[in-house]
Amino acid sequence: VRLDAVYRRDPDIVFRKISGECILVPIRRRVGDLDNIYTLNETAARIWELIDGRRTLAEIRDALAAEFAVPVQEAERDLLEYLAALRACAAVKEGPA
């Protein structure tokens, strides 16, 4: 994964905050997709918000490091780990919005 890459969210997955929890919900027409609702921690929720089809992964990493007051290496590790999970469930794709 290149840090100069840009990712965009799948428009068929929506982000919701319900009772203090952040979740991703597929809105595709297949009923089986409803079994795939994902609960996000605070960092993962912020990464989802920052993946907008305009920011590079490096820009997202730097924003996370600043917002959560963590070392850049830790922010990068968290970003790449969550990005791998998002790619595995096809919630994001590489390329501009």
Feature locations, PLM:
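Long, low-complexity, charged/polar intrinsically disordered regions in eukaryotic proteins
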Residues: 1-31
